[in-house]
């Protein structure tokens, strides 16, 4: 995206929050109560309002449940689930096959705090897609910052009309490090798996330096030509068919030859902040354009690796540290903010990495890449704050 769109590395977070998806270095957004006696003595099934369908993710201490809902007197669909004493994190997901906007009305923790309410402290109001509402799918991730925890006990929710609500619930010990399995895919005929290996190494190095180990599987080539160039909208039928091929227990990276239509030139985008985890569906992966990272027939491996890592950050719940205009920032308290009021030196209304040097321009989740001159001079975006690392280490599909 350094033809103007390279700066748009990642479309604006709140475009996505009202989101269609997360464009590379884009961002998209981003909150119950019963007595919990004997929680530690009972199984999750005994304590949760779940159906009989349960899926254990291979190699992970994460289980997927569909939650039974009932219609309340207020007209909302209501349900509950119980987080055991060793609960680490959860992703509560809501689906609507018609692709109309869908969201939760409330999510209340065991202490009675509605984490989706603007009046609660802290809260995920207007941060979580599960509060804002998005087409076909939305979710709430806990923790999406260290200010939240998957408190043991009964959580309750109210939701608008939907097809189903499911939860990916991770249990185990408190993580000080993490391992995440990544599955790369490549489409088109211009580049092959070998062409992205250097970028995957860059991506792996970025996460390793921040306390996260990536297990990167061999790249899978998808030869069907309809997937060479796809829309960045995850409800698009072709994009949906591509992303649905991803593995449930992995972060799926789809290196496409290019985007189609007006999306062409964008570096990449994720299905949400976070996207889906633990279920194979249309929101279970990220898209990365190879054409947007090409210089002639050669791929810019450092930039491509940063883009892949950035979009993976979105998929696991990280926002842009600073959004395009320098007036919107992420929900973490330890990431640098680059304010328009004193850093937009050229007064164009867009915060560049150069203007924000020393103020988050080098963060992996800054909204746009360094320009070509800065990259040639060795500038990189590889840093993550302690709180950003926390979100990744607690991800439901990490171990």
Regions from the language model: what does each represent?
Residues 297-384:
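The catalytic-center signature of Zn2+-dependent metalloproteases
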Residues 213-293, 300:
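Active-site-proximal segments of metallohydrolase catalytic domains
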Residues 160-190:
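Exposed low-complexity, polar/acidic, P/S/T/G-rich flexible segments that act as propeptides
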């Amino acid at each position: 995206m350094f033809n103007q769109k390279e700066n748009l590395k990642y479309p604006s977070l709140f475009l996505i929050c009202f989101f269609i998806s997360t464009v590379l270095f884009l961002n998209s957004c981003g909150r119950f109560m019963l007595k919990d006696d004997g929680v530690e003595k009972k199984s999750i099934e005994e304590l949760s309002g779940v159906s009989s369908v349960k899926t254990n993710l291979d190699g992970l201490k994460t289980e997927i449940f569909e939650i039974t809902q009932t219609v309340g007197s207020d007209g909302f669909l209501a349900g509950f689930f119980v987080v055991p004493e060793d609960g680490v994190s959860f992703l509560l997901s809501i689906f609507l096959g018609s692709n109309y906007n869908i969201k939760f009305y409330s999510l209340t923790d065991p202490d009675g705090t509605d984490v989706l309410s603007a009046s609660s402290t802290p809260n995920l109001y207007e941060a979580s897609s599960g509060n804002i509402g998005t087409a076909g799918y939305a979710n709430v991730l806990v923790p999406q910052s260290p200010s939240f925890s998957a408190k043991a006990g009964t959580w309750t929710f109210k939701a608008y009309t939907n097809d189903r609500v499911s939860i990916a619930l991770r249990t185990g010990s408190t993580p000080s490090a993490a391992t995440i399995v990544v599955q790369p895919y490549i489409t088109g005929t211009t580049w092959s798996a070998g062409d992205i290996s250097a970028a995957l190494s860059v991506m792996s190095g970025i996460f390793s330096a921040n306390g996260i180990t990536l297990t990167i599987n061999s790249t899978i080539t998808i030869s069907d030509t309809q997937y060479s160039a796809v829309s960045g909208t995850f409800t698009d039928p072709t994009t949906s068919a591509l992303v649905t091929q991803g593995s449930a227990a992995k972060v799926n990276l789809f290196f496409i030859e290019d985007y189609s239509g007006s999306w062409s030139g964008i570096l990449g985008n994720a299905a949400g902040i976070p996207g889906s985890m633990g279920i194979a569906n249309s929101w279970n992966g990220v898209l990365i354009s190879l054409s947007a990272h090409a210089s002639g027939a050669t791929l810019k491996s450092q930039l491509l690796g940063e883009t892949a890592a950035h979009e993976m950050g979105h998929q696991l719940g990280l926002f842009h540290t600073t959004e395009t205009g320098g007036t919107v920032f992420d929900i973490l308290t330890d990431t640098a903010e680059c304010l328009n009021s004193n850093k937009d030196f050229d007064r164009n209304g867009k915060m560049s990495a150069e203007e924000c040097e020393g103020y988050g321009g080098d963060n992996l989740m800054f909204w746009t890449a360094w320009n070509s001159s800065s990259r040639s001079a060795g500038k990189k975006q590889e840093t993550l704050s302690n709180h950003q690392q926390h979100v990744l280490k607690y991800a439901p599909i990490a171990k």
